[in-house]
Amino acid sequence: MLKYLNQAEAIKVDQILFNEYKFSVDQLMELAGLSCAHAVAKCFPSPCQGNDDKAGKLRVLVCCGPGNNGGDGLVCARHLALMGYEPTIYYPKPTAKPLYENLHHQCELMEISTISQCPSVEEAAHSYHLIVDALFGFSFKPPVRSDFLSVMELMQQTKIPIASIDIPSGWDVEKGKLNDCELEPKLLISLTAPKLCAKHFKGQYHYLGGRFVPPALQRQYELNLPNYPGTELCVKLS
């Protein structure tokens, strides 16, 4: 049976990947973000995949937080652009570290716009077809900081479908949706292994991404991950 990780286990698995298997943060972030882009493309295909017809592209608002989840979002945005989408980044609190600065710089050179103000519910409905939620990961602890209140309000009130990376933002990593959080993504992309909160996910699509977990680590934690089909970077869980 597929294992769902609690917060301590998720942190420990990450530490083992970094310290024992010598993966770098940017290496795992690239693989994770790429798998997220593939999951998005499966669930929300753009009519203009593979061509430059900007007018017909699926417009995606990628909301990035200050940590690794936000970095995954920046990578995801870059790959979505290469796949025929038109991503726009909302990055309210950029991280002043070379890794994140470089990821954002790459997006800028690929002509991916970054907006400085969170759009209203009405503005978002007019401008975007999809929102990628890359705000908070499994290290999140409430309350939500003031920098992210407006985007959290947008994601809870919008009718636009939302794709959440690893953890729906504002959810408890183990207990799921908290009383003051109404965020209900249509797509959840669990990374490495699903977290306990994913058991409370009621959306339409649940995918697993991050095809990089060594077999010995899978056995050590009895993860029982599903087999990825062929050369796929993500696998559907439900």
UniProtKB/Swiss-Prot annotation:
Reactions catalysed: (6R)-NADHX = (6S)-NADHX; (6R)-NADPHX = (6S)-NADPHX
Annotated (6S)-NADPHX binding sites: 68-72, 137-143, 166
Group of enzyme by EC: isomerase
Keyword Oxidoreductase: no
Positions bound to K(+): 69, 133, 169
Keyword NAD: yes
Cofactor(s) this protein cannot do without: K(+)
Gene Ontology CC: one annotated term: mitochondrion
Keyword list, A-Z: Isomerase, Metal-binding, NAD, NADP, Nucleotide-binding, Potassium
InterPro entries with a match to the protein in the record: YjeF_N_dom, YjeF_N_dom_sf, YJEFN_prot_NAXE-like
Cofactor-binding details, from the entry: Binds 1 potassium ion per subunit.
UniProt GO molecular function: metal ion binding; NAD(P)HX epimerase activity; nucleotide binding
Superkingdom of this protein's organism: Eukaryota
Protein purpose: Catalyzes the epimerization of the S- and R-forms of NAD(P)HX, a damaged form of NAD(P)H that is a result of enzymatic or heat-dependent hydration. This is a prerequisite for the S-specific NAD(P)H-hydrate dehydratase to allow the repair of both epimers of NAD(P)HX.
Matching PANTHER family: NAD(P)H-HYDRATE EPIMERASE (PTHR13232:SF10)
Record family assignment: Belongs to the NnrE/AIBP family.
Record-given protein name: NAD(P)H-hydrate epimerase
Species of provenance: Drosophila willistoni (Fruit fly)
